[in-house]
């Protein structure tokens, strides 16, 4: 197995008296793709913010594993980004504002080329389609050539065909950058086929495992075809408990398979 990049040890997070994350233990390795899934309010975005250091856990520890003499470099793509429509800004200018030190023109150009939108450098951010906007955010995340790329619901506002294209692009970025990828998905069952590990989250880690190939599911193949099945996969949950309407754990006397509403 590849060397670890980051380790989360018994992470708990509370906002006021409200538990958000409970007992999270997770190790992310070099060049690994980890997809985090779970219902709304499960703590997915909070977990990626803990991973990126945007918020500190209430208790527990995070270990960054140095890569030779280089510190861990994290690229982050947020779930949402709202721009003031009264303030026009071009794509290239938007990218120049990334990080404490403005990236060079050549770095911005290279990032846009890597995500396939070099032609949009002079476009206004407000005129972009949903898929184009997501690619700009992705370009921003890779400007510093991270060895850990964290993507919080990167497929928002993108149709199914656009999702497949983005999944292919993400796989290419892993190969080009040799980086690990942590990706949040709002879909409980459909994940990127190249995913090495799936974490099902509902405040705590409900289950953790490998996705099953979507090619085994004839109904999906009928809808989207074999080509789509190469880029998407289905994850089957295997829980020994369920959650009540408040998100609290309720145990099962026997092993139970279920879904979150």
Curated annotation (Swiss-Prot):
GO biological process: response to zinc ion
Catalytic reaction(s) noted: Zn(2+)(out) + ATP(in) + H2O(in) = Zn(2+)(in) + ADP(in) + phosphate(in) + H(+)(in)
ABC transporter domain location: 6-227
Recorded GO MF terms: ABC-type zinc transporter activity; ATP binding; ATP hydrolysis activity
Keyword terms of this UniProt record: ATP-binding, Cell inner membrane, Cell membrane, Ion transport, Membrane, Nucleotide-binding, Translocase, Transport, Zinc, Zinc transport
Topology relative to the membrane: Peripheral membrane protein
UniProt-listed Enzyme Commission number(s): 7.2.2.20
Recorded GO CC terms: plasma membrane
Translocase keyword on record: yes
Class in the EC hierarchy, top level: translocase
Subunit structure: The complex is composed of two ATP-binding proteins (ZnuC), two transmembrane proteins (ZnuB) and a solute-binding protein (ZnuA).
Function according to Swiss-Prot or TrEMBL: Part of the ABC transporter complex ZnuABC involved in zinc import. Responsible for energy coupling to the transport system.
Protein name (database record): Zinc import ATP-binding protein ZnuC
């Amino acid at each position: 197995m590849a060397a670890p990049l980051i380790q989360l040890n018994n992470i708990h997070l509370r906002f006021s008296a409200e538990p958000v994350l409970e007992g999270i233990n997770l190790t992310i390795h070099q060049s690994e793709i980890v997809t985090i899934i779970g219902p709304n309010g499960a703590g997915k975005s909070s977990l990626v913010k803990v991973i990126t250091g945007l918020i500190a856990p209430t208790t527990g520890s995070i270990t960054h594993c140095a890569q030779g003499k280089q510190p861990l470099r994290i690229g982050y793509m947020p779930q949402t980004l709202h721009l003031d429509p009264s303030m026009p800004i071009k794509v290239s200018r938007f990218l120049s504002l990334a990080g404490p030190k403005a990236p060079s023109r050549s770095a911005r150009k290279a990032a846009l080329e890597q995500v396939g939108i070099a032609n949009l450098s002079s476009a206004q951010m407000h005129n972009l389609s949903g898929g184009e906007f997501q690619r700009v955010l992705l370009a921003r995340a890779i400007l510093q050539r991270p060895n850990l790329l964290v993507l919080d619901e990167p497929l928002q506002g993108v149709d199914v065909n656009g999702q497949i294209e983005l999944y292919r692009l993400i796989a290419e970025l892993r190969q080009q950058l040799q980086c690990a990828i942590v990706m949040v998905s709002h879909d409980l069952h459909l994940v990127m086929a190249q995913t090495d590990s799936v974490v099902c989250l509902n405040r705590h880690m409900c289950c953790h495992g490998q996705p099953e190939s979507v090619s085994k599911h004839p109904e999906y193949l009928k809808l989207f075809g074999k080509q789509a099945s190469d880029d998407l996969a289905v994850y089957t949950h295997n829980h020994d408990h369920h959650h009540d309407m408040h998100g609290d754990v309720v145990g099962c006397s026997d092993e139970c398979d279920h879904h979150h509403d």
